[in-house]
Amino acid sequence: MSRILSAPDLKDAFFAGQFHRIAGTAAQVDGYRPFNEQAMFDLASGSRTALLIAAEDVGLGAMGREEAIGGAVVGAAIVGLGELDLVIQPASRGLGHARAALEEMLVDAPAGLTAWSHGDHPAARALANRYGFDNVRTLLQLCTALPFAGTTAAVDGPEQATSSASQQTSTGPATIEAFRPGIDDAEWVALNALVFADHPEQGSLTAVGLAARAAEPWFNPGDFLIARDRASLRMIGFNWLKIEGGSQSNDDNDSDSDSDDVIGEIYVIGVHPDAAGHGLGRTLMLAGLERLRERGCTSAELYVEAESASAVHLYRSLGFIDRTIDVQYRRHPR
């Protein structure tokens, strides 16, 4: 019922246009993106491949190339590295395109293939059950409104969240300062690997991956909060914030914002195991929320593993509530 179209990369203008059209339409209707950031980075680096799903009955062979792609494409996918991401445009759902495409892609799929269902879509759940995929990971997206009433409250006695991450601030036995590109890179990569040693994606981030993210339009070193031990100056924690389309700094409160809804993301937060259990995570969260408020954000969001009970408890205690759920499936051997 469907057929797979592929191109070497998204430098093919026609192919790229249709891929992004499908992804954008799905995001607009569903309320969440069909491909996560890591998948898009992998695609950009060439380590994974983009595919288009076309309706087989359109007769691609008899049509011109542009006409074929424009009129036949009903879905898109990203494959490679043992992972699969697939989306069908809303107007073409319920017609069997996802099932047909999945069956074709599973023919040569590696053992233990994983697939994400962003938004825990019922149709994806049904396909997972039908083709032998088990739920192996649940990721919660939580959100809260800003300004946040508790962002300047004292934490664990002398520790206090502070405003303006553009300059060094004291938080009891630690200081919080902005990330210094080209200086803090190696130390942060090492700490990130330690903190997320059991995390399949975040813990494997290299200096190259950090540089790729620092090159994104949204990156602002002032939104990358670094906690250091006051005595040793060792990096012991971080809270990296992300404001889409927001790399311009408001540090001096001299920027005007005409946006009615600006979402800031707690992109990744971590605390060195030796510093855990002393309130540093909460302090970094409060400092991050204050920073987002200063930057004009009206709400904050984050992603957290559902099984990370202590982290989920912290975020809920700060007023975060459920927004969406992402589920990762793994195909079990047959």
Regions flagged by a language model, labelled:
Residues 6-11, 17, 21-109, 114, ...:
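Conserved donor-binding loop and adjoining core beta-sheet/short helix segment
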